[in-house]
Amino acid sequence: MSDHNVNSTFRKTLVELCETATWITSQVYAAKNLEKNDLITVDNKISALYPIAEKYDRSFRTTTVILDEELILKLENAASSLWNSLTIAMKAEKASDKYFNEVFCKCKIFATKLLSIHEALFRTNTNLLRNFKCYISSFKSASEYRFDDLITNTQQHSEKYLQIINENVESFSNEEKTEFKKLTFEFYLVNFQLYLSENDLDTANIYTAKVNITDNSKYMDADLLIELCRMIYNSTVMLKEINNPETQLVDVNIISFLKDVEKYLELPVENLKSHTDYSNLKYSVLIFMANCLVEGHPQASELEQCDHYLSLLQNEYPNKVDPFILAINLTKRRNIVNPAETIEEILMRMIMSVDVISNFQAVIASINDLSKMNTKFSIVCLDYLLINKLNSKNDSKFLGKAICSRFLITTQSKTMNDSEIAESLENFSTQMERIVSEPLTKHAISCIITLLWNTGKKLEKMEKYVVSIRFYKLALKDIISQNYSDRGKIQRALQVVYNKIEDYSNTVRVYQDMDEVDRQSPLCQLLMLQSFLADDKTEEALTCLQKIKSSEDEKSTDALILAVAECKRKTDLSVQGLLMIFDKLQSKSNSQTISSTSSSQTLSILRYTLQMIVKVSEEEPLETFINYLPTVQKLLQKAVEFLKTVKLLNQLPPDVEKEAIYQQSVAVNEIEWFASFSYNVAVKCLVDQSCESISEFPQYCIQFIDLIPVQDFTFPKMYHFTYWRFKATILQLIIAKEKAKQDQHQKDWDIYEKSEELVNSINVMKKSSEFKDGSSLEDRNTLHECFLEALTIHLESALMMPDQTRILDILKKTELYQDSRVDALLIDISSNMEDLPKGVLIEILETVLKRNMGPEVKERELCSWLRILLENAINLNHEVELRILDRVLKILNINQSSLQDTDGVLQTELETIATYCWNIGVNYIIKDNKSNGIVWCKHSMGFANMVNEGLQEQLYSLWESLASSANIDINSIAK
């Protein structure tokens, strides 16, 4: 290819580079409106052309190319324009978008490369220095934004230019040499900053030596030096953040760099100390260095440095609070005997030096911190601040906060005893009257009173009543609570303590100091009632009860109940008070009034009232209890209705409007209490036979239990409630039996049906897998006892009805249970019923005795059943099946060796059975039924043989006579 063609190609490419630079310049001037797609286009163009520009730069340095001056000038102008536009745009925009900054950095490097091509075509020292300067600037931008690839590129090119210039520096003029030194200095500075930010301290120190700022300060003006110091400071801050913030050692590298900055700030640079940023930067450097030293657990050698810098800071910057705080922290880290005293001294210097208002939070925090070590020292500092540093009118906001802090650190003190705390605050409250000229804010008053209230309550709970009184009295001082809306609450608390120490005269004195509204408070009247009762002033106490009853306060009902409870030792007063409770409750008995009662009080009123009735009734004759029963019934009915309403409304969607009283969750134990109370009242009524409406109470118990979501509980809790529902139903049936006097048949029939339903329900529970898996032995026993109780009622009701079919049904059902206890129950009930037809009794006995009886049936019980059967069979001339006798005799023979009869009952039973069998046998023989007669007589001797050989001998003797007279073979019964 000819030189002409080569030059033509170069020319075309350079023209394209110039046009691209010009186009990019236009984009840069529109930087505010650039979208990401625009940036991508710019980025793509640079990525495509930069390698070509790089190639041309190298070629032009090794190959001579002849180009017209106009093109070379155009290249310079395009590159310079692009560079200048970028410089302006990057200063103006300061974009936070990373890609924006990256593209603009690439643009700077592209512009620098074009200037480098120009320098290769038109070589001068000025162009060489300009390119070096541009590469340093690009290197600085890439370092600032942390674009690693661009950092490497610009750093390498800067190094290359540094080498080129060093090779040609002899030909430079003095001005050019000076410029080169400045640029070299700046290049080393950028490297220093880069390696320092990367925590490459060794390389950073190398560049520190190369920079040699102290000797080269003549090349620096105040702005550059301030910027340099700020850069090093910022780098050390970053380095501190990168390192473990909880390190236990002083970072010597950070301290070294900060000391360098301190030294640089003292260099003889013109206008340095008058620079607007000088003072703040120096303070930042010194305070950061002091902070690093103090926080790094300084050793003995470093403590002197800490003292030096803290002293320097406090002297040069007396209005700054941080040096004093650091001095306090350093004191804590030192192993000294009494650090609190030293800290107090530092705090006092701080308060006297700094602007307290602008540093209020820091000063108060330091005082609060000292209070944990020694509250008395902190109080000295805070009182000085309050008296000397705050103006009541101008600084009222801060004055209120400081006063609150005074009460806070004193009441929370761990280094003062209760009496010292009270005395300190009493003295301070006197000082407050001189300090405060304007009323304290509501917030400040509330804060102070809360602290005094809580302290008084804490001491009251600890039974330190005398000291607690001092805190309540402090809260009642006019300077503190004159405008407090709930002053009466504090006065009542004071009355409570006076009552506890039986200082009733002061209780009355506090009452006299109250506002009229607070005097009429139900709680205040309750406290006054206590004092009157203690002084045996019954009339005054009655007046208190009447005032509480008349009060419309939402707490008046509770207060009245508590007041009546206080009267328990005054029977007449107690009865009058109880009547007041009923009167007050009666006024709230209709639904409208009850619905307006506060939701938290509804059930408690009912519960407390019921408890009061029981309590009073226990100490009075039964008649009193009977008189109150209609009221009890009414209250329980109200409780049921209320809880049913709550349950129903809680099942509705949340957006359905409901009365406030029903928008509450009721605890299960609350419902259980009402169920238990209803049950116990029913039992008492049953025992005392004291109420016509007794059947309502077990029904209430059942209704309460039905309101409990037993399905939501685990088995033990579910069984507990189910069991008590069974018990309540049994109690209801027992009461129904007692009342069954008129319309006997109909009532027996109702009892029969209900008891049958109950027996079936219990059986279902017993057979359920849930019960079998989850029940304990005790659960199984208690449920079976419950089953037997229900079955007893069921059997009795069946036997009371003349319907033979029912009795047969009962016999069939009991056989299915296969339980000897059920059989025993069946016989016991039927045998003890005087009105039961004997034929029915015989049928029951025969049915039970025919069953396959297991070992659970005791021999005595078995003989008793047989004896009753034989006795009734003889009276009714009923033929008893012989297999019954065979079965009983067989069981007795099997168990003969283990028979126990310490009281002789079994012997009597067997002797009676033997006698009955003998008589039946004789009757058969008389009727010429000799075969049956022989069998019965033989069984008679068998039973006699079990317990009484004498009886057997006697019977056999009779048999010989009987057999002889009846022509029966005597040997048909073996002796």
Curated annotation (Swiss-Prot):
<protein>
    <recommendedName>
        <fullName>Sporulation-specific protein 22</fullName>
    </recommendedName>
</protein>
<dbReference type="GO" id="GO:0030435">
    <property type="term" value="P:sporulation resulting in formation of a cellular spore"/>
</dbReference>
<dbReference type="GO" id="GO:0007129">
    <property type="term" value="P:homologous chromosome pairing at meiosis"/>
</dbReference>
<dbReference type="InterPro" id="IPR039057">
    <property type="entry name" value="Spo22/ZIP4"/>
</dbReference>
<keyword id="KW-0469">Meiosis</keyword>
<comment type="similarity">
    <text>Belongs to the SPO22 family.</text>
</comment>
<dbReference type="GO" id="GO:0090173">
    <property type="term" value="P:regulation of synaptonemal complex assembly"/>
</dbReference>
<dbReference type="InterPro" id="IPR013940">
    <property type="entry name" value="Spo22/ZIP4/TEX11"/>
</dbReference>
<dbReference type="GO" id="GO:0000794">
    <property type="term" value="C:condensed nuclear chromosome"/>
</dbReference>
<dbReference type="GO" id="GO:0016925">
    <property type="term" value="P:protein sumoylation"/>
</dbReference>
<dbReference type="Pfam" id="PF08631">
    <property type="entry name" value="SPO22"/>
</dbReference>
<dbReference type="GO" id="GO:0007131">
    <property type="term" value="P:reciprocal meiotic recombination"/>
</dbReference>
<dbReference type="GO" id="GO:0033235">
    <property type="term" value="P:positive regulation of protein sumoylation"/>
</dbReference>
<keyword id="KW-0749">Sporulation</keyword>
<comment type="function">
    <text>Involved in chromosome segregation during sporulation.</text>
</comment>
<dbReference type="GO" id="GO:0035825">
    <property type="term" value="P:homologous recombination"/>
</dbReference>
<dbReference type="GO" id="GO:0106069">
    <property type="term" value="C:synapsis initiation complex"/>
</dbReference>
<dbReference type="GO" id="GO:0005634">
    <property type="term" value="C:nucleus"/>
</dbReference>
